[in-house]
Structures are given as C-alpha cells and as structure tokens.
Amino acid sequence: MTDFRQDFLKFSLAQNVLKFGEFTTKAGRRSPYFFNAGLFNDGASTLQLAKFYAQSIIESGIRFDMLFGPAYKGIILAAATAMMLAEKGVNVPFAYNRKEAKDRGEGGVLVGAPLKGRVLIIDDVISAGTSVRESIKLIEAEGATPAGVAIALDRMEKGTGELSAVQEVEKQYGLPVAPIASLNDLFILLQNNPEFGQFLEPVRTYRRQYGVE
C-alpha cells in the first residue's frame, strides 16, 4: 500500500504547487521550499486534490457531520471534497461563507447547507490562523460545533512564539488539525528520492532553525 502523503507531495511537485529553491516567506524567512495551493487550478488537479483531502479526513478519525469552507479558497475545497467523500460512502452537506453579506436571494454571509452538528473546517494551510478563528466564530454563532480543521500542508514551523500556527489552533480551541502532509513527510520525500538530494540539507537546516516537534 502506498503512502498517500508521499503521493500527495509528488503530485504537488508535478503540478508546480510545491517547489524547491530559495524563497522568502511572508514572515521574511528564507525558505528552501514553497507551497502554493492556488496552482491546483484546473479540473483534473482539483479532483485529485479532493481525493487526497477525503482520504486524509477519513484516516484522521475526526467525527464530523458537515464541511465548511472559508472564503475564498475553502469554497471549492469544501464542494470538491464533499463529492469525493460521497464517493467513499460518506455523504455530508457543506457550506461556505461570503466575504460580503448579501441582502437579497439567500442573503447573509452563509451559503449552502445550514451549519448544524459537528462542522469540519477545510482550508489550504494555516498561516496566521485568522481564517480558522473567523470560521469558528461563524460556526458557533449558528449554534453548531467546530469539529476540527483539514488542511493540505502543515509547515510545522514556529510563528511569533514557540508554537506553530497549527499548534496554536490546537491549543487555543482544543481542535484537531488534519493535514494531508507535513514538513516531516516532505523530509522523508527528500531522503528517499536522490534527485532532490541537493535540497535535503537546506530543509534540514530550516527545520532545525524554525521547526517545531
């Protein structure tokens, strides 16, 4: 049985979503890799991405009743992943929010199924955690319960303190975060594929400097 986490990283490389080299993060750090989920931008790649999300969510064991995708990136992720979960026999409703409230038609900021029960938030990454915090407020305001967060990649690096953005969400809200892959999985990919050998030491150094356990 293949490791779907490694398959996801290889797929991300093939789509140029994951790149190795020298990059500057929003925090001003020099990073040896870059991950841009926005480049999953056609039907085939979005379909495959949703399959990885569905598998990761099921294997996480998180109990949930529906999906919520925060605008804007989470909208397509929630819809596509709901379809892939249905193919695996897990048929759940989904919803998303608008950035701006609408005063006609459906109205309000929420679109899709009513937020009820245990709601799993789905997004691409957790950076500052702002999107997650806003999603939690929306979910709780509707009387529902946040169940956890599903993301594509956990960079496993410190924020302003000693914790990563993912760890801060887990600690502050007591919610599980289920990434398809993490920095540890990326490190394994580099170790097992000699063609990427030149990036092994830079990633090791970066992890030593900024990484969390």
Curated annotation (Swiss-Prot):
GO (cellular component) term, any one: cytoplasm
Sequence intervals crossing the membrane: none
PROSITE patterns: PUR_PYR_PR_TRANSFER (PS00103)
EC number: 2.4.2.10
Binding residue positions for orotate: F34, F35, S127, R155
GO terms assigned for molecular function: magnesium ion binding; orotate phosphoribosyltransferase activity
The family this protein is said to belong to: Belongs to the purine/pyrimidine phosphoribosyltransferase family. PyrE subfamily.
Protein name: Orotate phosphoribosyltransferase
